Amino acid sequence: VITGAGGVLGGSIAKCFMQQGAKVVAVDIRQEQLDKRVEELKTYGEDVIGIVGNVLDIASLEKLADDIVAKWGRIDILLNIAGGNMPGATLAPDQHFYDMDISCWEKVTNLNMNGTVYPSLVFSKVMAKQGKGCIVNVSSMAAYSAITRVPGYSAAKTAVANFTQWLASELALKYGDGI
């Protein structure tokens, strides 16, 4: 399962998986980009499904997980790639942090942080039942070195990096090396 598969990074990773013979579920909120990506991926094999999905909607993620298990019997890998910045969330060179539109901050931090946490929550349950699986969360260099003028994005990617460390140790305590 690859979230953000309609984008450049998600699409490139999906392509690599397809080239290795993996079954891929490409998830993206943008229908048109997802459709184009799935058509491109089908040149590498037929085991690809495109699902329009919202990584911030737990109920739809649960349905997605159930549908995948019903079709293929298991979920081996979750790649949390969905995320990004948005217009209005980037400060202009002459703009101060206190001038930022708080609604942009909330949208960017919600997408980048919870867009990783929610799929991890849902798919880790499936992997726990299986006794194994792999969750890969994509953060950014912004997590380790603040990028000028993108405070929400930088803060959220720092949260993703820390959440990833926490989740790995939490799952290791319960499942060993299985997840």
Task: Annotate the PLM regions.
Residues Q20-K36:
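Conserved glycine-rich Rossmann-like NAD(P)H-binding loop of the short-chain dehydrogenase/reductase
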Residues D76, G84, Y98-Y118, K132, ...:
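Catalytic Tyr-X3-Lys loop
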Residues Q31-E32, V52-L64, I102:
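The beta1-alpha1 cofactor-binding region of Rossmann-like NAD(H)/NADP(H)-dependent oxidoreductases
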Residues K125, S169-L173:
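Alpha-helical segment proximal to the catalytic Tyr-Lys
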Residues V1-V25:
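Canonical Rossmann dinucleotide-binding motif of NAD(H)/NADP(H)-dependent dehydrogenases/reductases
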Residues S140:
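Residue(s) in the substrate-gating loop at a strand-loop-helix junction
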Residues E62, N85-E106, K129, R149-G152:
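Conserved mid-core segment of classical short-chain dehydrogenase/reductases
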Residues S120, A156:
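Active-site helix of classical SDR
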